[in-house]
Amino acid sequence: MTWNLWYVFGPFELRREAIRRVIERENPDIVCLQEVFCVRVGTEVRTFADELARDLGMNCFVSDGPWFPRRSSDEDGRDVGEERAMGNAILSRWPIESHGQVTLPGKDSDAGYRKAVHARVNTPWGAWPFVCTHLNHRFDESAVRVRQVDALADLIRDLRGNSDSDLPVIIGGDFNAVPDSDEIRRLTGRTEPRHANLVLSDVWEQCGDGSGLTWRSDNEYQADANWPNRRLDYLFVTWPRPKPMGHARRAWLAGVESEDVDGRRVQPSDHAAVVADFRVG
């Protein structure tokens, strides 16, 4: 499952319960989350992903920063030194053996603020690598996203291991790009990939039913969107892989409908989630 949670925007106190309900109902083994609300005061860090993991009985790894100061006062009016971050996270039903993050390039190839997090999960079928990311969002930043997917491909190559025998890498994220964009075509092999013998299978394209739109005009938060009705959120799995391990069997959307929270109908996020089942043998 992959889902952009829309940070702390909108009616967040209601949305956070709606988000929890959707994830609990879907009951996924792995969840890739973007725009996770993170707060740091001194050495204490609290994140919405950790909150979800506790509520759902899952393990969690959350990206670290970048942190931005936010003026916040205690009861006596003193600045508490609060910082906030918009993070990426991986939640897992099974123990996380190892984890890390990389910073993706920004404009002019400088280090940006977008990150990719990765976790190697101790599943019943062996150590399985997962990656979660969130790319730049502006319409005019396709070239930046191409550099970002190249950095992502470097990471995936290093995580993959032996493509003939090891478990494939599964990637989830908000790529802020439609399927025929240069950046997605580069990942899926429709143009020359970053690395020979490494392309990503688009799970929705292979087994999803319908358009798979995740940025939707029927979402109440999209009333003023410049370009609604796009498929921006993806689950990918690496190819080649030891078939049928990692083949996607079916894919569907979640979090599209509103939830009743405290007597009010609220949509969980401005994005729909993408959920899929994969073959494991």
Task: Describe every region a protein language model picked out.
Residues 9-10, 39-42, 69-72, 87, ...:
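Short catalytic/ligand-binding loop motif for oxyanion handling, primarily in non-cytosolic enzymes
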Residues 12-16, 109, 145, 149:
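A conditional alpha-helix N-cap/helix-loop micro-motif detector
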Residues 12, 36-131, 135, 253:
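Structured beta-strand-rich core segments of catalytic domains in phosphoester-bond hydrolases
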Residues 25, 54, 82-84, 110-112, ...:
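Extracellular/periplasmic catalytic domains that process cell-envelope and extracellular macromolecules
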Residues 10-24, 266:
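N-terminal membrane-anchoring alpha-helices
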Residues 157-170, 177-281:
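Metal-dependent phosphoester-hydrolase catalytic domains
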Residues 1-5, 19-45, 91, 119, ...:
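Active-site beta-strand/loop signature of hydrolases that rely on acidic residues for catalysis
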